[in-house]
Amino acid sequence: MAALAAAAKKVWSARRLLVLLFTPLALLPVVFALPPKEGRCLFVILLMAVYWCTEALPLSVTALLPIVLFPFMGILPSNKVCPQYFLDTNFLFLSGLIMASAIEEWNLHRRIALKILMLVGVQPARLILGMMVTTSFLSMWLSNTASTAMMLPIANAILKSLFGQKEVRKDPSQESEENTAAVRRNGLHTVPTEMQFLASTEAKDHPGETEVPLDLPADSRKEDEYRRNIWKGFLISIPYSASIGGTATLTGTAPNLILLGQLKSFFPQCDVVNFGSWFIFAFPLMLLFLLAGWLWISFLYGGLSFRGWRKNKSEIRTNAEDRARAVIREEYQNLGPIKFAEQAVFILFCMFAILLFTRDPKFIPGWASLFNPGFLSDAVTGVAIVTILFFFPSQRPSLKWWFDFKAPNTETEPLLTWKKAQETVPWNIILLLGGGFAMAKGCEESGLSVWIGGQLHPLENVPPALAVLLITVVIAFFTEFASNTATIIIFLPVLAELAIRLRVHPLYLMIPGTVGCSFAFMLPVSTPPNSIAFASGHLLVKDMVRTGLLMNLMGVLLLSLAMNTWAQTIFQLGTFPDWADMYSVNVTALPPTLANDTFRTL
């Protein structure tokens, strides 16, 4: 028995290598079960899907496999694969990442966060609302992981002020391995700094203590449960609102940009999705979901009942709220007066958002109509604005300097240096996006998309509204266990083909699939933000499952509502567009041999 256990441990420790070596062998039958080109393409896609789900290779390294495998297997020449990694969509995302880097460089995000918390008040349910609003707003422009990692230390400081000392933590023996595994699972290279900060702060303030309820009566179970719930409510609201906020803008999360890139690959004539049209659709959905999520989390953890805020607040709680208010005010004052660099970055950030929104908002002519049609994309706007960051001075310019020959002749630092951008921009995401676009191009060129469409024939009788609901549920479930980026890369080609089969607007199915990838609330391993919050040690898996189950359900229902109401007007979803009709004509007009092989397989 001991030998068996030792062997199992050996296998587990080498699991990534085993997956790496044996997956290609296990997938070999796929190559021979389909027509040659489609079979080889499906082999590559399934191989990448397994590697992404198991992380046998780093996600970004797996995304590079099409560069090697597509040319070797005769699916796509190298000169068609490599450009997919640097489409204009990638540059739009890169510009968003660089803008986020400048915001973080000058601590503008922290100033915004503390200001919002000062405005909403310090009652627990209101503070949870403030946390959620702040995190979701930041997540619209920063990465979900960065927003969560930035907000957690703020939440930690507020909670310690509310309760005087340390929150009663769960038994450290419980699920300690899950905490570690959750962090490792998502490869959070930015997390240790924040987690070390949280741990070191608590350790310094209270060495050797595990529970010091100085401010609350030791014999009061209700008070103990109250503060434990408040702690959980704070921590669980931050990753959830980060995931929700990322859906509101095209640059907020990677799946949104993958949708844009794959639309251009499958339907080159499609121009209805851009920053402005997406914001008009997704921002109201985000607000509704944020409100529903806040009510649910506040009901569970924040003292909110069906009759409003619970009354009979003790003097202890009143004093705790006064301390929290003082901590927030002190943290804000520690930032000092607003610097010139902060003002400059804020103005450029506003220009970035406004110009992207007004380029071609669809309901009115945008400023892009002043130029040659089709020449300008959102990438042009994004790159133009972030370029300014690298030469605009971080200190207020002065005319006197030119005439004062005694003044020091030192070069003023720009708002953002390239060295800083290199250090803070997650370049791996750019490669991951490119891998998704290369995969979509391979599906299109090999005819695999047509084969997939044939397999979806039994679904032609499914009502479109029901299809939207089913798609969102399936993808939301799948993304609980796999990266949302990998999930949408795998599913979007299938959804595009299903839309053609159903003769419905492709966006009617592709948008729910894309947004549904962000509805991963039930498990610590679902997203990096979930893992960060879980690794703090105050949450149990059952807390996330209990809270996240209804969050998932609300997200699915609200998304279905959006797709069948205002999205119909924004994207003209009630009609089958000409650009999709052209695609269906092109894919059915196949060479006779390919058509025969495909339908023989069916």
Curated annotation (Swiss-Prot):
The keyword Metal-binding does not apply. Optimum pH is 7.5. GO terms for molecular function: alpha-ketoglutarate transmembrane transporter activity; citrate transmembrane transporter activity; dicarboxylic acid transmembrane transporter activity; glutathione transmembrane transporter activity; high-affinity sodium:dicarboxylate symporter activity; sodium:dicarboxylate symporter activity; succinate transmembrane transporter activity. Expression is highest in kidney. Detected in placenta, brain, liver and pancreas. Residues 1-16, 77-82, 159-229, 300-336, 394-422, 444-461, 527-546 are cytoplasmic. Keywords: Cell membrane, Disease variant, Glycoprotein, Ion transport, Lipid transport, Membrane, Sodium, Sodium transport, Symport, Transmembrane, Transmembrane helix, Transport. Glycans are attached at residues 586, 596. It is a multi-pass membrane protein. Residues 38-55, 104-137, 251-278, 358-372, 483-505, 568-602 are extracellular. GO terms for cellular component: basolateral plasma membrane; extracellular exosome; plasma membrane. The chain crosses the membrane at residues 17-37, 56-76, 83-103, 138-158, 230-250, 279-299, 337-357, 373-393, 462-482, 506-526, 547-567. It is found in: Cell membrane. It catalyses: succinate(out) + 3 Na(+)(out) = succinate(in) + 3 Na(+)(in); 2-oxoglutarate(out) + 3 Na(+)(out) = 2-oxoglutarate(in) + 3 Na(+)(in); N-acetyl-L-aspartate(out) + 3 Na(+)(out) = N-acetyl-L-aspartate(in) + 3 Na(+)(in); glutarate(out) + 3 Na(+)(out) = glutarate(in) + 3 Na(+)(in). It is linked to Leukoencephalopathy, acute reversible, with increased urinary alpha-ketoglutarate: An autosomal recessive disorder characterized by acute, reversible neurological deterioration during febrile illness. Patients exhibit reversible leukoencephalopathy and increased urinary excretion of alpha-ketoglutarate. This is Na(+)/dicarboxylate cotransporter 3. It comes from Homo sapiens (Human).
